[in-house]
């Protein structure tokens, strides 16, 4: 069964409608999962800080919900992911109240606390207060663009899985995901960006719904996400001091993977340039240096990314460091 949100509110002062939405859903007593910086947006309900929750104990995490009829995540990625996980384990509805728009986790059924990611259910309601979101750090909103453009290469990888490995593929989900990315890119390249936060939130919610339709992260996560996860491993392995975000890394990864698809004549140069210009338009990183990585680190990440998940992509069985360097140079990432 496909589960998608029953209520999606995307507007200024949307948070004022939380009591109304709860009443419509016949919910009286939610537990709010939030952070210290976003606690101020919760004025009415019991709450717990996300960093006080032990997420490794999956069997007992449901106990946080014992005295409540629902779970509400208020904040960025981690409060929302942890809220989804508690709701899933306790079999209670989840409401997503994002305070920024850096990735499609605000709407998807995926929990990305660990790798591989964890499938739960999509939120029963999404309340996105644009007045709050547009005040969030520009870096977070730029990262959201990186997460959206990655749909282009993710869908290409999914189609490749269907062709080369007879993988199950959903035309409706694939087309929906790709269209969301193209429409947002078209907007940022042909506007003054005044409505960018709202357009971005709509795109991220649409991307999350495409995942719910497919019941798989495939329409929004491919080899570019593997590249991002590889960079996360590099950060820890080499103790690299950079504040690069998931969406930023996915955006740069999308350029690298798009270059490979271009060389295999499966993506045209116009689409590649559209991706690059869209990232630049919102001041998202397009080079390794802008992410905070040396050339050799991103080369190692690209050449090792294929091994991080049993998922067929354009990386197939992996590429050598020599090949990775050529791809990264041609795409001007290094």
Swiss-Prot record:
Subcellular location: Cytoplasm
Binding positions (substrate): 104, 147, 229
EC number: 1.1.1.261
Positions annotated to bind NAD(+): 77-81, 99-102, 108
Pathway: Membrane lipid metabolism; glycerophospholipid metabolism
Chain sites annotated for binding Zn(2+): 147, 225, 246
Cited SUPFAM superfamilies: Dehydroquinate synthase-like
Cofactor: Zn(2+)
Cofactor, free-text remark: Binds 1 zinc ion per subunit.
InterPro entries reported in the protein's UniProt record: G1P_dehydrogenase_arc, G1PDH, Glycerol_DH
Domain of life where this protein originates: Archaea
Main location: cytoplasm
Catalysed reactions listed for this entry: sn-glycerol 1-phosphate + NAD(+) = dihydroxyacetone phosphate + NADH + H(+); sn-glycerol 1-phosphate + NADP(+) = dihydroxyacetone phosphate + NADPH + H(+)
GO MF term set: glycerol-1-phosphate dehydrogenase (NAD+) activity; glycerol-1-phosphate dehydrogenase (NADP+) activity; metal ion binding
One Gene Ontology biological process: phospholipid biosynthetic process
The entry's keywords: Cytoplasm, Lipid biosynthesis, Lipid metabolism, Metal-binding, NAD, NADP, Oxidoreductase, Phospholipid biosynthesis, Phospholipid metabolism, Zinc
Signal peptide: none
Family of the protein in this entry: Belongs to the glycerol-1-phosphate dehydrogenase family.
General function of this protein: Catalyzes the NAD(P)H-dependent reduction of dihydroxyacetonephosphate (DHAP or glycerone phosphate) to glycerol 1-phosphate (G1P). The G1P thus generated is used as the glycerophosphate backbone of phospholipids in the cellular membranes of Archaea.
Official protein name in the record: Glycerol-1-phosphate dehydrogenase [NAD(P)+]
Naturally occurring in which organism (per UniProt): Methanococcus maripaludis (strain C5 / ATCC BAA-1333)
Gene it is expressed from: egsA
């Amino acid at each position: 069964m496909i589960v998608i949100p029953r209520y999606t509110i995307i507007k200024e002062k949307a948070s004022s409608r939380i009591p109304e939405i709860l009443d419509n859903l016949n919910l009286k007593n939610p537990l709010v999962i939030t952070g210290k910086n976003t606690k101020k947006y919760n004025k009415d309900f019991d709450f717990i800080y996300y960093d006080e929750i032990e997420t490794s104990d999956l069997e007992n995490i449901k106990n946080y919900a014992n005295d409540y009829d629902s779970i509400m995540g208020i904040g960025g990625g981690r409060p929302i992911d942890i809220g989804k996980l508690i709701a899933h384990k306790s079999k209670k509805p989840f409401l997503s109240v994002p305070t920024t728009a850096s990735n499609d986790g605000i709407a998807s059924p995926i929990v990305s606390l660990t790798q591989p990611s964890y499938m739960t259910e999509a939120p029963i309601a999404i309340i996105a207060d644009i007045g709050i979101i547009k005040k969030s750090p520009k870096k977070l909103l730029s990262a959201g663009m990186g997460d959206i453009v990655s749909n282009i290469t993710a869908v290409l990888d999914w189609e490749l899985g269907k062709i080369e490995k007879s993988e199950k593929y959903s035309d409706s989900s694939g087309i929906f995901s790709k269209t969301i990315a193209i429409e947002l890119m078209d907007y940022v390249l042909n506007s003054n960006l005044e409505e960018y936060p709202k357009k971005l939130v709509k795109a991220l919610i649409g991307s999350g719904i495409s995942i719910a339709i497919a019941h798989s992260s495939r329409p929004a996560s491919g080899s570019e996400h593997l590249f991002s996860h590889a960079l996360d491993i590099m950060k820890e392995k080499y103790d690299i001091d950079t504040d690069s975000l998931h969406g930023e890394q996915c955006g740069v990864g999308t350029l690298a993977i798009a270059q490979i698809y271009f060389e295999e004549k499966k993506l045209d140069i116009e689409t590649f340039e559209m991706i690059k210009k869209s990232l630049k338009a919102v001041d998202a990183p397009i080079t390794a240096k802008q992410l905070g990585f040396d050339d050799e680190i991103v080369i190692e990440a690209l050449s090792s990314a294929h091994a991080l998940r049993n998922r067929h992509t354009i990386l197939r069985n992996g590429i050598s460091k020599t090949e990775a360097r050529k791809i990264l140079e041609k795409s001007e990432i290094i």
